[in-house]
């Protein structure tokens, strides 16, 4: 499956910008709340197989997460922008991997959507997440 890029006319461009602006405004407070990552939905562990410290983050435990399923890509983009993490896609899980300078070891945030994303085929090809740096492993 190939993504075909076409130039938007002015009306389409304006409508798309309006949609993104509305979606962003509606989800920003929820995203900011996610970034607090309280301990009840966040746990560090050492993965002996990959030899990496991992941070398991389960957004489903947050009551607002099911209310914005169509905006997960905004949340992912925002997390990537503010954290600077490289994004690796593995099935229904998204791994954010970043070198931890203080510790000298890589840290990993594993965000598991439990296959709630509808178009996984599109997601794997990067069609839904715009500028995210998605790499299949």
UniProtKB/Swiss-Prot annotation:
Top-rank taxon, per record: Viruses
GO CC terms, sorted: host cell cytoplasm; virion component
Principal location class: virion
Keywords in alphabetical order: Host cytoplasm, Late protein, Virion
Location(s) in or outside the cell: Virion; Host cytoplasm
Induction, as annotated: Expressed in the late phase of the viral replicative cycle.
Subunit: Interacts with host TBK1.
Family listed: Belongs to the asfivirus A137R family.
Functional description taken from the UniProt entry: Plays a role in the inhibition of the host innate immune response. Mechanistically, promotes the autophagy-mediated lysosomal degradation of host TBK1 and affects IRF3 nuclear translocation to block type I IFN production.
Record's protein name: Structural protein A137R
């Amino acid at each position: 499956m190939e993504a075909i890029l076409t130039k938007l006319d002015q009306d389409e461009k304006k409508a798309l910008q309006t949609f993104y602006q509305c979606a962003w405004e509606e989800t920003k407070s929820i995203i900011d709340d996610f970034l607090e990552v309280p301990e009840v939905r966040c746990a560090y562990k050492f993965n002996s197989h990959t030899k990496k410290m991992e941070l398991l983050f389960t957004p489903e435990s947050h009551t607002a997460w099911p209310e914005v399923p169509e905006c997960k890509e905004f949340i992912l983009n925002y997390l990537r922008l503010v954290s600077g993490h490289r994004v690796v896609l593995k099935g229904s899980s998204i791994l954010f991997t970043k070198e931890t300078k203080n510790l000298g070891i890589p840290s990993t945030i594993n965000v598991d959507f439990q296959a709630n994303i509808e178009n996984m085929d599109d997601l794997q090809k990067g069609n839904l997440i715009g500028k995210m740096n998605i790499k299949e492993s």
